[in-house]
Amino acid sequence: MIQHPRIGIRPTIDGRRQGVRESLEVQTMNMAKSVADLISSTLKYPDGEPVECVISPSTIGRVPEAAASHELFKKSNVCATITVTPCWCYGSETMDMSPDIPHAIWGFNGTERPGAVYLAAVLASHAQKGIPAFGIYGRDVQEASDTAIPEDVKEKLLRYARAALATGLMRDTAYLSMGSVSMGIGGSIVNPDFFQEYLGMRNESVDMTEFTRRMDRGIYDPEEFERALKWVKENVKEGFDHNREDLVLSREEKDRQWEFVIKMFMIGRDLMVGNPRLAELGFEEEAVGHHALVAGFQGQRQWTDHFPNGDFMETFLNTQFDWNGIRKPFVFATENDSLNGVSMLFNYLLTNTPQIFADVRTYWSPEAVKRVTGHTLEGCAAAGFLHLINSGSCTLDGTGQATRDGKPVMKPFWELEESEVQAMLENTDFPPANREYFRGGGFSTRFLTKGDMPVTMVRLNLLKGVGPVLQIAEGYTLELPEDVHHTLDNRTDPGWPTTWFAPRLTGKGAFKSVYDVMNNWGANHGAITYGHIGADLITLASMLRIPVNMHNVPEEDIFRPKNWSLFGTEDLESADYRACQLLGPLHK
């Protein structure tokens, strides 16, 4: 059984005996316990279980105790460490020197003991040794007897822990390519060096003929298929057929295609994570799957010119429910765009919520909207907006039909209600695919995302000579007047899901205008997640040594390892590039 990755908590202490160390033991260990309690009571793994912490077997005052802690952490699947102390300790003697996991140090801001002095000293040692560490120091002085964690310290501890857990959850998993390069899209030219060196992941690949082989040979659960077919007939609405008359398929052929795409979903899922039921049916090899945390399906053109497209499979894999009930989502990229798949994965691991995969299709200026519709944009939309749309791989949770405190949200599966599932299905239909583009047919997904949701759009790009770079745009979904929506939506493919998105502007750089956001976006796709998580993404990127080339996160929310400041404090973007380039990938 694979263990969850854990956070290791290291209480370090002044090693001087005969009074000094003894007087600090309880306070120091209590700091460790309070951090562990904070993390375990606040954060959850993607399966909904509380995050686990491991505390060192004793306080750490000298090298043998640091070594004992290191050994315990190795056995306990610790993916990151947090060192805590209220006092002076011996810097390089007590530090954790593991170079391939993130580290953070919280130095208590008090006057009785110099916790801040240790923090500065050990961070200097980390910088000298080339092992980055995040420094955490409360803004306000606390009393020595104060056991509470200040709010600013909590925020940094949790931001660090979320990002660190993401690195641990990715390590030793796989990206599964189903097919190869789709229509020459750069993101579907899968780069194994990137996955191995930056994420600690491996790459697996199957030809798309694996789908037809499993269908032809019955390598799927026939009982589940019958249950799925019944559920789809009762719950999934087939949408309007927009095809011209000579391309409309017969009712009999559409019914066959529904059966086909349901099997595609089952096979795609089984390829990713396996299915013990297949072993019972005599298919032991296929039952184990590919240990894939994220996958992509090429589809176009070789598959979709002949077979039904992958939209239904992609949509329901990314969605938090199916005929088996409510469950955690899979992370699945259309067109095998591995870089957008990784963008979705970053978002998912930081939020435990499903993702919208979309083309960054169109920038609508206020002037263009006025000319086409007669409508004057206002509010969040006043500066214009982006049309996000793609036929597949867009979670049904993207409808915004789930709610929290009366507002539309996308939330973890363990919070999802059956009534919200039904609302998502009611507000979605599945039109027959546009056969001018998808000659083999299939079914696309059509819905409109509710407005006023805070969201973050993300894209990872590969730059020759530099490596991966990340771009982040926080903003809000929009709800346009119905007639305006239909006028704009019908100018593209009305059979696809639409999200109207207004990025938050800052007045500088790539965020001077919505046009500049569109113009600086690095690829044709984006990964959209619920919430403003740009600060968490920046922290995660720094752990992986991926520079951020574009973001609209307030400077006070940026949290990177302390040695980033030694690369410069005025131009943070350039300092980020230099730090990442010098330190190199986390797993190299």
Curated annotation (Swiss-Prot):
Gene label: fucI
Q: Which reaction does it catalyse?
A: L-fucose = L-fuculose
One BP annotation, GO: D-arabinose catabolic process
**What protein am I looking at?**
L-fucose isomerase
Family per UniProt?
Belongs to the L-fucose isomerase family.
Q: Does the keyword Manganese apply?
A: yes
InterPro entries according to UniProt: Fuc/Ara_isomerase_C, Fuc_iso_dom3_sf, Fuc_isomerase_C, Fucose_iso_dom1_sf, Fucose_iso_N1, Fucose_isomerase, Fucose_isomerase_dom2_sf, Fucose_isomerase_N/cen_sf
Binding site residues for Mn(2+): 335, 359, 525
